[in-house]
């Protein structure tokens, strides 16, 4: 048996198996050969003709694609080279597989595994290496039979699925027809086409039962209509049916509106919860402005008289501080303050002194970390009747400091301690070595060496007059608690803010001893006074050790004479011009509530407290009066 007879027998079986109309398959199989090399293309054509295939050749991939598109049913197999100039063989493979669904055999001289794998993954049914042999081309017909069998199976599966779907539709149509027949008996047409109507209704019901309801997407415009409808009805009276009527939108059901309304109510509830939580936090921290809520968290320090919110930092109002200082109840003592109200002159320099704990006071406004440097002036009608344009400067306190020299600049430096609410004036070592020559005990630096500029020479030696009553050098200055401070222009009478107000302690309170030496120096209207003193006081006993009182003639800059006093311990002395501290001050058992705030309204923050070697707290700050 020859090869041709064997091929004819196989072809006959193939034709009968494939159901084709041709005899002796694969004789006459239509093959399209594509190769850019004319020699290879000619050899391939001769081999295909020896296999009795119907061959069509072309040297360009674009031409081959054009032939396939024009004659879709005129070819059974495509043999294409991989590397071509106008189009890659893999690209042609993809296009043929997508558009014509024909088996494609790749032909190349490159037999690398990656190249072969690439051709197979792109849909090639076989990959042949050059030069092609006749035995390989004689068996290429099997790819055509395999593709036809796969198509037949797919068609059979599609037919079976279609028949099943048709059966289900028929059952649904029959069920729907029965229902519609019952319902359509009452609504028959005038023409009597009951059967047609029932069939149409059954078809519609069958289609609606199999179709899936479209999902509603709430766009921005749709949500705006929903919100407008809810606002029009009110959130309490809004129901899905009314909202749907007001929206007047197609393809939206009542269930869709009900679901969206539930989500919208949950959203509003969450917003109200967040707003109430923020309001509660703001109320708990006491913050009026939400930007300062974090600052209000330090409100617990108010119990210790340390910090308080600063209302303003521009100027000090007399209503906040001085009015409370005028009343004895503000300090918890009686009889200390003079009946005349305290007046504060206009500040000409910046406030730059920490007055946080001067004299144990903690009321008023606070200015953070500031040192007060201001010129306090008194009224033109001053309390010194014999001084017309002098420059006496005094600080209200219990005693006066001794004098060192005259006709020098006077710079008053008072170092304050604010380690606790019961802090008093604490100084530091003298900054000028040649000035530290006295160690007399005192409480507040008071310049008493005052040089008259020649305007009036009739000043008494040691007697000062304030508002009429005669004031003795020691007792009057100690008991009056009000000494004017005068500048070049007498504008206001000011009580010293640095006075140490004695405070009543509990019996369990340990003594607070403060020791320091202060070197002060002020310049007032070309009058120069030097003072250097130290502090050594026990507050519970309110004792003054070795007090010295300056006595001088206030004329032409003569130096005063420092005369020692008798023992300064104050117990139960009944002096007309001197206060009884133990009787008046021990009435209270602690700081009153009005004193706890102190000068916190002036200074926002205290300086950082440090510790000396002996454990006495102090603050390295100063108060400078220029």
Swiss-Prot record:
GO BP of this protein? cytokinin-activated signaling pathway; phosphorelay signal transduction system
Q: A single GO molecular function, which one?
A: DNA-binding transcription factor activity
Q: Name one GO cellular component term.
A: nucleus
Q: What happens when the gene is disrupted?
A: Dwarf, narrow leaf, lesion mimic, low tillering, late heading and low fertility phenotypes.
Compartment list: Nucleus
Q: Which InterPro entries does UniProt cross-reference here?
A: ARR-like, CheY-like_superfamily, Homeodomain-like_sf, Myb_dom, Myb_dom_plants, Response_reg_B-typ_pln, SANT/Myb, Sig_transdc_resp-reg_receiver
PTM per UniProt? Two-component system major event consists of a His-to-Asp phosphorelay between a sensor histidine kinase (HK) and a response regulator (RR). In plants, the His-to-Asp phosphorelay involves an additional intermediate named Histidine-containing phosphotransfer protein (HPt). This multistep phosphorelay consists of a His-Asp-His-Asp sequential transfer of a phosphate group between first a His and an Asp of the HK protein, followed by the transfer to a conserved His of the HPt protein and finally the transfer to an Asp in the receiver domain of the RR protein.
Residues with the modification 4-aspartylphosphate, per the entry, are 81
By its UniProt entry, which SUPFAM superfamilies does this protein fall under? CheY-like (SSF52172), Homeodomain-like (SSF46689)
The UniProt regions of compositional bias labelled Basic and acidic residues, in chain numbering, are 151-162
The record's keywords, sorted A to Z, are: Activator, Cytokinin signaling pathway, DNA-binding, Nucleus, Phosphoprotein, Transcription, Transcription regulation, Two-component regulatory system
Renumbered residue ranges of the record's region Disordered: 1-22, 151-215, 402-440
The annotated regions of Gly residues compositional bias extend over 9-22
Question: Which positions make up the DNA-binding region?
Answer: 210-269
Q: Record keywords: Acetylation included? A: no
The UniProt function text for this chain reads:
Transcriptional activator that binds specific DNA sequence. Functions as a response regulator involved in His-to-Asp phosphorelay signal transduction system. Phosphorylation of the Asp residue in the receiver domain activates the ability of the protein to promote the transcription of target genes. May directly activate some type-A response regulators in response to cytokinins.
State the similarity comment. Belongs to the ARR family. Type-B subfamily.
Protein name as it appears in the record? Two-component response regulator ORR24
């Amino acid at each position: 048996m020859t090869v041709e007879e064997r091929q004819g027998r196989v072809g006959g079986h193939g034709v009968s198996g494939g159901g084709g109309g041709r005899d002796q398959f694969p004789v006459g199989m239509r093959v399209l050969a594509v190769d850019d090399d004319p020699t290879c293309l000619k050899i391939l054509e001769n081999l295909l003709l020896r296999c009795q295939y119907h061959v069509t050749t072309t040297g360009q991939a674009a031409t081959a694609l054009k032939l396939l598109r024009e004659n879709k049913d005129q070819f059974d197999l495509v043999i294409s080279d991989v590397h071509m100039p106008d189009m890659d063989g893999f690209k042609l493979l993809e296009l043929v597989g997508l558009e014509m669904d024909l088996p494609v055999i790749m032909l190349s001289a490159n037999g690398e595994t990656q190249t072969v794998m690439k051709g197979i993954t792109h849909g090639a049914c076989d990959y042949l290496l050059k030069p092609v042999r006749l035995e390989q081309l004689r068996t290429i017909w099997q790819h055509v039979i395999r593709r036809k069998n796969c198509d037949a199976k797919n068609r059979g599966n599609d037919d079976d699925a279609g028949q099943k779907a048709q059966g289900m539709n028929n059952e649904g149509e029959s069920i729907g027809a029965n229902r519609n027949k019952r319902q359509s008996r009452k609504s028959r047409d005038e023409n009597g086409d009951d059967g047609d109507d029932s069939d149409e209704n059954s078809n519609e019901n069958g289609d609606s039962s199999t179709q899936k309801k479209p999902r509603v997407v709430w766009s921005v415009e749709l949500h705006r209509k929903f919100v407008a409808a809810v606002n029009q009805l009110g959130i309490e009276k809004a129901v899905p049916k009314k909202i749907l009527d007001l929206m007047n939108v197609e393809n939206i059901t009542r269930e869709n509106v009900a679901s969206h309304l539930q989500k919208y109510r949950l959203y509003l509830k969450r917003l109200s919860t967040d707003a109430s939580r923020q309001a509660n936090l703001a109320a708990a921290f006491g913050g009026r402005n939400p930007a300062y809520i974090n600052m209000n968290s330090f409100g617990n320090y108010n119990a210790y008289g340390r910090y308080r919110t600063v209302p303003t930092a521009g100027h000090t109002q007399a209503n906040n501080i001085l009015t409370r200082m005028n009343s004895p109840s503000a300090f918890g003592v009686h009889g200390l303050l003079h009946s005349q109200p305290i007046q504060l002159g206009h500040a000409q320099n910046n406030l730059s002194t920490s007055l946080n704990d001067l004299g144990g006071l903690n009321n008023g406004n606070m200015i953070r970390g500031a040192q007060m440097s201001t010129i306090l002036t008194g009224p033109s009608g001053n309390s010194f009747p014999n001084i017309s344009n002098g420059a006496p400067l005094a600080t209200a306190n219990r005693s006066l400091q001794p004098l060192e020299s005259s006709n020098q600049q006077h710079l008053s430096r008072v170092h304050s301690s604010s380690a606790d609410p019961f802090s008093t004036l604490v100084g530091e070592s003298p900054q000028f070595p040649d000035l530290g020559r006295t160690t007399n005990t005192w409480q507040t630096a008071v310049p008493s060496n005052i040089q008259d500029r020649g305007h009036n020479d009739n000043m008494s030696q040691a007697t000062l007059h304030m508002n009429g009553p005669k004031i003795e050098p020691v007792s009057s200055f100690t008991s009056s608690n009000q000494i004017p401070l005068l500048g070049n222009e007498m504008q206001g009478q000011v009580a010293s803010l640095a006075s140490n107000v004695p405070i009543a302690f509990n019996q369990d309170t340990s003594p607070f001893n403060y020791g320091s030496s202060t070197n002060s120096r002020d310049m007032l209207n070309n009058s120069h006074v030097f003072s250097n003193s130290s502090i050594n006081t026990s507050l519970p006993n309110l004792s003054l050790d070795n007090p010295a009182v300056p006595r001088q003639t206030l004329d032409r800059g003569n130096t005063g004479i420092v005369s020692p006093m008798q023992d300064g311990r104050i117990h139960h002395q009944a002096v007309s011009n001197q206060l009884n501290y133990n009787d008046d001050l021990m009435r209270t058992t602690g700081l009153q509530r009005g004193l706890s705030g102190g000068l916190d309204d002036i200074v926002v923050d205290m300086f950082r407290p440090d510790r000396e070697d002996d454990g006495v707290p102090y603050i390295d700050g100063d108060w400078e009066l220029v």
